[in-house]
Amino acid sequence: GVRAWASQKAVELICRHSPWFGLQGVDVDGLRRRRGWEGAEPHVVASSHLLNRVHRHSRLVSEGLLVIADDHHLREDSRTAYHRMRSRAVQGLSDGKLHHLLDTMYFGPSNQSRLLQAVDVLTYFEQRRRHVTERHRDAVRRMNAIGRSLNKIRQHSYVWTP
């Protein structure tokens, strides 16, 4: 229908701007079993790994990168981890200091930021194509088209299994 068409067009429009799109996860059960990591927040671990990956990419950008994230309940823990990672290498989380990323990590509600809304759209469809089996022929066709667009921009997709 019209919503599927509009969704496909929205993804194509976002992808036309060639954003760096990456997904990072963590095996929560494995994290809980790993000695020394039992109390680690999975969200903070995954976002730290992703920030490390973004930093590797940012070395190509001389003026540095601004990090904007969707507001969430662990924002202060994430901000603390971010500052720690900018000042020194953190074992298990970063290759070295994240000095190419600008000094502050900004959090905001996605309903007030077109950038965060764009990330939400891409993330929603990436998760949907991984976890939902489409049954309707037209939905399969639309999701395949959306998937092709996502494949062009997705540069990182990994689940860390401690």
What are these regions (language model features)?
Residues G1-P162:
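Phosphate-ester processing/binding pockets and catalytic centers
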